[in-house]
Amino acid sequence: MHSTSETRSGSWLSVIALALAAFIFNTTEFVPVGLLSDIGHSFDMPTSQVGLMLTIYAWVVSLASLPMMLLTRNIERRKLLVGVFLLFIASHVLSGLAWNFPVLMLSRIGIAFAHAVFWAITASLAVRVAPPGQQAKALGLLATGTTLAMVLGIPLGRVVGEALGWRTTFMAIAGLSVLTLLYLVRSLPPLPSQNSGSLRSLPMLFRRPALVCLYILTVVVISAQFTAYSYIEPFARQVAQMGGEATTLLLLLFGGAGIFGSLLFSRYSEAFPRGFLLAAILALGTSLALLLPFSAQPTWLMALSVLWGMSIMCFGLAQQSRVLRLASDATDVAMALFSGLYNVGIGAGALLGSVVSERLGLAAIGYVGAALALAGLLLALFTALRYAGALKTTSL
């Protein structure tokens, strides 16, 4: 059992448990990116149509995040996480058994509901259970779990899918989720709902213009990211003419770069908050603009993926940190909105990438994403200049 003093003093074991859960959830959200071709082959569908499963998943998360958070706001958080994981596991088993694409989509919707609750509460929980004075590092560790999903989860999911079939990938995630659930139950202390906010928090949050601009910026930049990233596997295979192993390595490098992005965030984000965010968006836009030119040489494309992976991780962490600072009195509502809008961006980007792939060809996805990133950079500049005072709030 966990004593009250342990809960109050914080524990790295609890933070690690949440980071493991973050690894699982981010792996399953994006693992279809590496399996689009295989899933399309199983159901005799083009990758542009299969890729819409990313859009539907993301938009279910975006629509469900706030309502699910409000419905569960009074539930003790450890019990809530257990329920979330049980739904998550059952839905993955259904994914592995899916006999047609609609059934696969139904299972993904179940996973999306679990995702909606998980990410609405996890960042604030990591801050709560962290040792005193280590809240920023706790967020960094949570981000490491997210990064490892890109580094190991998605490439390993692709390797397993190619060797044993994509269904096995989903079954393996279900098995790993069972082990993670057991660790969560053992390591987390009782966590009563705290500062979750309510529906009455929404008008208050939307009266904070810096926070509203932050939310809009998130949608724009994440749309830019997923216009290209959603279709990076078919882009690598068809445009860059890379083989299966090289494509897996490309995904591995992209994810691995996120580790360096999280380190950069931990070291420089508080010292240079404005410049850090602007540099991240500029690097992202540059990476997307160079995607097609660098596809002529696989080694160039792999090197570019490192900059790309670092930049999107830096952006996501910077935005998450700002949400927690600007809405410290209603963290769960604010993070539910952030998670929902982040997934609006994912869904919009995946949908736009599908349209671009069909109308202009896969080769154009980077240029369209770069144009959106440029719009995001201009918005970030406006926000930094207009609301500089609000963004200089106290640290976590």
UniProtKB/Swiss-Prot annotation:
Keywords: Cell inner membrane, Cell membrane, Membrane, Sugar transport, Transmembrane, Transmembrane helix, Transport
The keyword Cell membrane is assigned to this record: yes
CDD domains per the UniProt record, alphabetical: MFS_NepI_like (cd17324)
DNA repair listed as a keyword: no
Superkingdom assignment: Bacteria
Transmembrane segments: 15-35, 50-70, 81-101, 103-123, 136-156, 165-185, 209-229, 246-266, 276-296, 298-318, 333-353, 362-382
Membrane topology category: Multi-pass membrane protein
GO molecular function, a single term: carbohydrate transmembrane transporter activity
NCBIfam families linked to this entry: PRK03545.1 (NF002921)
UniProt record similarity statement: Belongs to the major facilitator superfamily. SotB (TC 2.A.1.2) family.
Reported function: Involved in the efflux of sugars. The physiological role may be the reduction of the intracellular concentration of toxic sugars or sugar metabolites.
Protein name: Probable sugar efflux transporter
